[in-house]
Amino acid sequence: MREIISLHIGQAGVQIGNACWELYCKEHGILPNGQLDQNKMDDESAESFFSPTSVGTYVPRTLMVDLEPGVLDSIKTGKYRELYHPGQLISGKEDAANNYARGHYTVGKEIIEPAMEQIRRMADSCDGLQGFLIYHSFGGGTGSGFASLMMDRLAAEFGKKSKLEFSVYPAPKIATAVVEPYNSILTTHTTLDYSDCSFLVDNEAIYDMCRNLGIQRPYYTDINRVIAQVVSSITASLRFPGSLNVDLTEFQTNLVPYPRIHFPLVAYSPMLSKEKAAHEKLSVQEITNACFEPQNQMVRCDTRKGKYMACCLLFRGDVNPKEANNATANVKAKRTNQFVEWCPTGFKVGINSRKPTVLDGEAMAEVSRAVCALSNTTAISEAWKRLNNKFDLMFSKRAFVHWYVGEGMEEGEFSEAREDLAMLEDDYERISSNAEPVDEY
């Protein structure tokens, strides 16, 4: 069995986790108390994400950590309270106050040991641990500081195992904290060498998707359910049998041409409301084309200005290989999708026969087929550029820096992180002009 452990860190990580596990349970026919739904056939596919117990229940292979107890308390009293083992929900007593240094150096240090102990316990119960999925936000104190501390420890203890991130990136216009640019650049710098592949999501792009689904005022629940659908499509091939499945290491092999250039752009189609779905039946070609439209991207950036290095198309549901290959060939032939000269083929296709599932009360319609595109494109460097500019504006005045220094951080770490991000920006620039990134490790 190839098991995967999911780590949900900070408020965003835990709330996305809540939505994901709710969806996984429905997909695998697992009830909120961990028992199998008698109407669903028991297939072993659940065991890569769920651990079967001696009494016949299934427990998620997951750990949820937050430095303040509020969000985890709501899970402990919520609908799925019986699903998790109490040791899987670890909270501190005071939060990281949007401060990377608190999450990484002071408050985070107090709970890293119990968290690592729980991870070791879960890893020991696996037959063949494939790797870790880490869910967190860049902007929060716990999501940035504690996540990078944990990834540092994971690299030391489980060096060879894959580590994939699902990260909430600060949206261009919506900020949840003034110091988001600091936290984001510090965490990107610290995790750059530890993460094998990082899928970015920005709230603004998801807000727009929710509006397309007819949700006028999206709540975090709506946003997280959209993210959960996308994560489910990316992980479907790890959980269900399929004719062209993709495993964890295949993502890296096919999407990451250089170790640091590991931030694929994620797009998902179709995003249909129930009203629209009643009048539309989209073909494989149509949903594939839609994945290259800006409104279906998880991060705001202009792909026409960038070049593709690689693209992974993960189809699920009613799709046959011939249709998938034709759709891919047509996308490749389009002049707007430019590939770098040294990567002429550029497409990897995965097909999974299990169609997408939607949760009760969700705005999204149930469809017979969907596709998730993971594209490594130089256009995503726009996101780093925006963030670097915001960082520079604040750091030139040393604004808010004393909060970080007061928690044991050195001011030099800011400059070091910023230099690293400048190099990352430069690497993308060089690839765009068909040169190689500098100094390849």
Swiss-Prot record:
GO biological process: microtubule-based process
Involved in polymerization (site feature) positions: Y441
Catalytic residues identified in the record: E250
Top-level taxonomic group: Eukaryota
Molecular-function GO term, any one: hydrolase activity
Sites where the protein binds GTP: Q11, E68, S137, G141, T142, T176, N203, N224
Electron transport listed as a keyword: no
Signal sequence interval, chain numbering: none
Record's protein name: Tubulin alpha chain
Subunit: Dimer of alpha and beta chains. A typical microtubule is a hollow water-filled tube with an outer diameter of 25 nm and an inner diameter of 15 nM. Alpha-beta heterodimers associate head-to-tail to form protofilaments running lengthwise along the microtubule wall with the beta-tubulin subunit facing the microtubule plus end conferring a structural polarity. Microtubules usually have 13 protofilaments but different protofilament numbers can be found in some organisms and specialized cells.
Gene Ontology cellular component terms for the protein in this record: cytoplasm; microtubule
InterPro entries registered for this protein in UniProt: Alpha_tubulin, Beta-tubulin_BS, Tub_FtsZ_C, Tubulin, Tubulin/FtsZ-like_C, Tubulin/FtsZ_2-layer-sand-dom, Tubulin/FtsZ_GTPase_sf, Tubulin_C
Coiled coil: none
Chemical reaction(s) catalysed: GTP + H2O = GDP + phosphate + H(+)
Positions with a binding annotation for Mg(2+): E68
Disulphide-bonded residues: none
Gene3D superfamilies per the UniProt record, alphabetical: Helix hairpin bin, Tubulin/FtsZ, C-terminal domain, Tubulin/FtsZ, GTPase domain
Enzyme Commission code(s) on record: 3.6.5.-
UniProt entry keywords in alphabetical sequence: Cytoplasm, Cytoskeleton, GTP-binding, Hydrolase, Magnesium, Metal-binding, Microtubule, Nucleotide-binding
